[in-house]
Amino acid sequence: MLRSEKPVAVEDIVNIYKESPSVIITHYHGLTVSQVSSLRDSLKSKEAGFKVVKNTLAKIAANQTGLDSIANLFAGPTAIVYSKEPVEMAKLVVNFAKANDNLKIIGGIVDNHVLDEHSIKELSKLPSLNELRGKIVGLLQAPATKVVGVLQAPSSSMARVIQAHASKN
């Protein structure tokens, strides 16, 4: 990389750190081009990205954005995975790492909190934001449907009693 290209590359990484509240740092040594392409495609469908970074430039970008605590994670063949939705991204990366031993999760950041590999795996087990919204809506609707059922029950049971009494006579 030319010296004149380095500030532009650092600025790209700084923008990723600023615009994405969640970043996972990985080692990708041994992944084939087709495996990386497959990972990128699956991430793209979830509005996430995968970027191979130079460690020194990633450290500089981390220092410029106040993320000094992750600078020590950049060693070896490093790539960052970034997204605005941490749970979906973590699920994709963890599942891909299970299927491909050459992708190693090193750590990451979610909302300025540094996570280790274990924490990212635990994050991937959580329901996504959309799943949580669906559960909340379901919980809010459940009492209303129960109230309607309770209100309708006396009138329907009263109608059955009258019908039974009428059929006897």
Swiss-Prot record:
GO molecular-function annotation terms?
Answer: large ribosomal subunit rRNA binding; structural constituent of ribosome
Q: What is this protein called?
A: Large ribosomal subunit protein uL10
Report the sequence similarity comment from the record: Belongs to the universal ribosomal protein uL10 family.
Coiled coil spans: none
Q: What does this protein do?
A: Forms part of the ribosomal stalk, playing a central role in the interaction of the ribosome with GTP-bound translation factors.
InterPro entries given for it? Ribosomal_uL10, Ribosomal_uL10-like_sf, Ribosomal_uL10_bac, Ribosomal_uL10_bac_type, Ribosomal_uL10_CS_bac
The alphabetized list of GO BP terms reads: translation
User: Which Cys-Cys disulfides exist here?
Assistant: none
- Read off the PROSITE patterns from this record: RIBOSOMAL_L10
- Quaternary structure and partners: Part of the ribosomal stalk of the 50S ribosomal subunit. The N-terminus interacts with L11 and the large rRNA to form the base of the stalk. The C-terminus forms an elongated spine to which L12 dimers bind in a sequential fashion forming a multimeric L10(L12)X complex.
Is Transferase among this UniProt entry's keywords? no
Q: Can you name the source organism?
A: Rickettsia felis (strain ATCC VR-1525 / URRWXCal2)
Tell me which GO cellular component terms the UniProt record holds.
large ribosomal subunit
Q: Can you tell which superkingdom this protein's organism belongs to?
A: Bacteria
**Keywords in UniProt for this one?**
Ribonucleoprotein, Ribosomal protein, RNA-binding, rRNA-binding
